[in-house]
């Protein structure tokens, strides 16, 4: 059986599924699916654009986020100078997946913050971070696209009360929120004096948000080269 030959010398053997897969690839090529996707052509899915064109922001987010690199790097430098050593991300699903991936790939870089991700309501895990992290040296990242995720808001209430008992009226300075414009979390951030509220583009789904603020804020705290990361993502696109 002959191998399928793709671009850049790629070859693949698909066994008994080869004919079906080759036919599907040919159909994708004939219908210009890739080029239409990058043009955000909603007719790839449905004849009407509702709930499609406003979910394709991930296609060009690597280019769009380049202008925010300096801001994120300056914020990280400021946090390090203030003595922050740990970062605890409070989030579920798409809001936590990219940070977890970045941490596993790059690890905790010396001289930057150690990143921890709390994406479980297991009482033992919540208590572990409550007991092991010093609130004076910990930055809490509250990450939810909708600003209504019950688990994340429960984490926020728990850890805010914990930090407030230890630090007092300036507890909000230990918190950063990442959310969509207009979400309830924006009001929370203003009310409780959060250090910063990052507003991510609303046309990106949670699981496609790796190169938005949801992924890049934690990446900056880890000391990852954001310019290089976004450059490589842009090339890949």
Model-found features: residue ranges?
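Glycine-rich phosphate-binding loops that contact phosphosugars or nucleotide phosphates
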Residues: 77-237
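Extended, charge-enriched "interface" segments that sit outside catalytic cores
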Residues: 2-80
């Amino acid at each position: 059986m002959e191998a399928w030959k793709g671009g850049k010398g790629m070859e693949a053997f698909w066994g008994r599924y080869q004919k079906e897969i080759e036919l599907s690839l040919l159909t994708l090529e004939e219908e210009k699916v890739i080029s239409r996707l990058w043009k955000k052509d909603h007719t790839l899915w449905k004849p009407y654009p509702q709930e499609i064109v406003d979910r394709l922001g991930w296609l060009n987010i690597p280019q769009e986020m380049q202008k925010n690199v300096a801001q994120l790097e300056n914020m990280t430098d400021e946090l390090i100078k203030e003595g922050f050593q740990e970062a605890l991300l409070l989030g579920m699903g798409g809001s936590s997946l990219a940070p977890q991936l970045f941490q596993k790939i790059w690890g905790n870089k010396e001289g930057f913050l150690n990143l921890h991700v709390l994406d479980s309501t297991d009482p033992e895990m919540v208590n572990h971070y409550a007991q092991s992290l010093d609130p004076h040296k910990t930055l809490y990242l509250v990450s939810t696209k909708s600003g209504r995720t019950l688990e994340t808001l429960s984490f926020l209430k728990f850890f805010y009360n914990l930090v407030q008992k230890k630090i007092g009226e300036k507890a909000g300075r230990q918190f950063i929120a990442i959310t969509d414009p207009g979400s309830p979390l924006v009001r929370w951030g203003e009310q409780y004096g959060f250090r910063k509220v990052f507003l991510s583009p609303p046309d990106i789904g949670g699981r496609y948000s790796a190169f938005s603020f949801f992924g890049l804020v934690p990446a900056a705290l880890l000391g990852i080269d954001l310019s290089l990361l976004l450059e490589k993502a842009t090339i890949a696109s």
